[in-house]
Amino acid sequence: MKNLNGRTHNACYHPYYHQSLHFAQQQQQQQQHHLQQQQQHMQQQQQQQQAPQQQLRHQQRQLPTQPAYQQSQSVAHNAFPLRSSSNNYGHVASSAYAASSGSHNSNNAAAMAAVCQMQNFFNQQQQQQQQLEFNNNCMPINYYQQQQQQHYPSESQSSASGWNPETPGQAQLALTATTCNTTAAATCNTTAAATTSTTATSAAAGSDNNHSDNFAMDASEIATFLANELFLQQLGNFETGQSVLTLTTPTLTPTTTRNIEDTLGHLLSDTQTDRVAGCAGFAVPKVLPNAIDVLGMGIPTGVSSLPLQQTFDLSLGQGSESEDSNASYNDTQMNEEQDTTDTSSAHTDSTSYQAGHIMAGSVNGGGVNNFSNVLAAVSSSRGSASVGSSNANTSNTPARRGGGRRPNRSTNMTPEEEQKRAVRRERNKQAAARCRKRRVDQTNELTEEVEQLEKRGESMRKEIEVLTNSKNQLEYLLATHRATCQKIRSDMLSVVTCNGLIAPAGLLSAGSSGSGASSHHNHNSNDSSNGTITGMDATLNSTGRSNSPLDLKPAANIDSLLMHIKDEPLDGAIDSGSSLDQDGPPPSKRITLPPMSTMPHVHLSTILTPTGASSGSLQTPITSTAPGGFGSAFPVTSNGSSINNINSIGNNMNSPTLNAHNKVPKERPNTLAFQRPLGQMHLTMANNKAGGPTQIQGVPIQTPSTGTFNFDSLMDGGTGLTPVSGPLVPNSSSTNKHPLELPTPTAEPSKLVSL
């Protein structure tokens, strides 16, 4: 994560870190006071063993004070003065403060204590023998602690003779060495950084000393001292209640580990000749593979067990408290972004940023943790080979690609290469922008297409709903209309007429095919239809009286119908208000007919006026047998119904069927056609005598006293035989028809009764 200035992400949490340091300031001061008292106590013990050195130690105890330290820090603040004739301690303090100015007042006391301790070391080394020092450096630290605990007098004698180890607390040093192994991930980074900075500072101070030939301070002692300081700094952060996980403390990185290996590893393998050759008493570090082990167990015996003190990070600059982790990130991410696109504004080169704030005098331009530049500058008088090895170790770090976005800009990159990289980055930015735009456009097009399809689908769904509702309404109307529909349904018969007569069921197909010819040839008929009756309603074809349709309803029970017929006397005059009288002409136009027995074959033209004999009543009984002339002309069909053909010109039509090819124009009949009801009517003779009354289902049949003709029927071309009195034989047709539509001889001749 980068902040707005392109700095390291740890700078974002800078206030929290200083707050934790501010909370730890009081504890640091208390520990420093305690350590100073402990130092004084140990120095008193050493004065008893080393009487000649007591006065020197007394002077050393008075040297570094807080005001003097603050005055000397303004002398050299931003650089490491390696060669100068100014105050030695002022340079040491100012260098330490320049590296740790980000830690505010809490690091001032720690730096003061560190300077005091180093001054004690410097003065002690002037009176020590380097051979014993080398022997002590080769001993393990644990063995050294055991020797100090078990053989303190003998160790003190050896210290008096050559090497003077200050032993303020062996248990504390052991705790430090042990804890460095357990908490290496949290402390080794700051340990190495502080070790390097203070080592370089003390080396610079030692090189300025006039007695540099006799001065030979062991670098491992300084490293151990700073390790204790840094460990207690981390421990103080824990004690203040601030969690280390939330703070931006430096972490252990590969660069930090390598630097620790370089420094401490070479200190273990240092020789007397190298120590003599180097003015500061140590040589250029070399790479060793075990850094953590060196920190934990490999610290030489000559390391002074310094007092426990809350430490400070000497390698931090003003800009950030974690520049070392930033530099290690840069080392591992060398040249990461050469072929990538970086659109962020935080493309600041971190190495140059660090060099501007911390390593202003650096030659090789490495990061903060690459403190071998300082060591190379200190040992610049030693030889070009050592300096070359240092440069090879620091500036020629191989690139490690482990992810991330911030690259390390190479220091030796030419302006042309930088310009090419900038152009390449701009091209990548433009290409990425075009790619994003294409994706956005494609997404928008697909979205619009989807919206159109959704709208179309919605409209289709609405249309389907409308059509479904319409279909349901039509089905409902059809279902409700079917119960009251007057048209014939598909399961009913189709009736065909021929010359106004109804054809039998056997010729329905022929009649339907010849219905057109029937309507053209039948000029004398009153047929107003096209020859086919397609309905159940009797009023469809009732315009002509000679074309009454066939009632297709099933025949009701005649016996039950006859029981409801009212028995009325038929001898008297017919009431003008009767239903039968309404069908004929008025009484003034009616003519009387003579009895049928006197004129069986009288032509209609001979009937002019009623005769006197016609006044008598007609008591002609109905015989049980039909006349011989009617038998062949009106045969009885198998279903109990008969078809009567009127033949008045001698052309007998004996065929039981009628079709359109056998039509003959109708003429006025001169006889009354009578058909005895068979099958549907059960005639019972009361007696077989002539003139006996005939009964139909127990009802006597009587003829009227005077038979009358229907004058209107005669004028219309009919037979004029419309009955005006007398009981008619009830049938299914007469029970359902309107009184104006009673049977006529042309329509249903079989339903007439002889008068």
From Swiss-Prot:
It comes from the Eukaryota. The gene is kay. Homodimer. Heterodimer with Jra. The kay-Jra heterodimer binds more stably to the AP-1 site than either of the two proteins alone. InterPro entries: AP-1 (IPR000837), bZIP (IPR004827), bZIP_sf (IPR046347). Residues 418-481 form the bZIP domain. The modification Phosphoserine is found at S548. Residues 420-439 are annotated as: Basic motif. GO terms for cellular component: cytoplasm; nucleoplasm; nucleus; transcription factor AP-1 complex. Residues 23-66, 149-159, 341-350, 383-397, 510-531 have a biased composition (Low complexity). SUPFAM superfamilies: Leucine zipper domain. This is Transcription factor kayak, isoforms A/B/F. Residues 23-75, 149-168, 316-350, 383-440, 510-552, 716-755 are annotated as: Disordered. It is found in: Nucleus. One of its GO terms (molecular function) is DNA-binding transcription activator activity, RNA polymerase II-specific. GO terms for biological process: collateral sprouting of injured axon; compound eye development; dendrite morphogenesis; dorsal closure; embryo development ending in birth or egg hatching; establishment or maintenance of cell polarity; follicle cell of egg chamber migration; G2/M transition of mitotic cell cycle. Residues 446-453 are annotated as: Leucine-zipper. Disruption phenotype: Loss of isoform A causes embryonic lethality. Belongs to the bZIP family. Fos subfamily. Mammals typically have four copies of fos, Drosophila has a single gene with multiple transcription start sites giving rise to multiple protein isoforms. Keywords: Activator, DNA-binding, Nucleus, Phosphoprotein, Transcription, Transcription regulation. Developmentally regulated transcription factor AP-1 binds and recognizes the enhancer DNA sequence: 5'-TGA[CG]TCA-3'. May play a role in the function or determination of a particular subset of cells in the developing embryo. It is able to carry out its function either independently of or in conjunction with Jra. Pfam families: bZIP_1 (PF00170). PROSITE patterns: BZIP, BZIP_BASIC. Early expression in the embryo is mesodermal and some of this expression is localized to a region surrounding the cephalic furrow. Later in embryonic development expression is ectodermal, corresponding to muscle attachment sites. Also observed in part of the mid- and hindgut and in the anal pad. Residues 316-333, 539-549 have a biased composition (Polar residues).
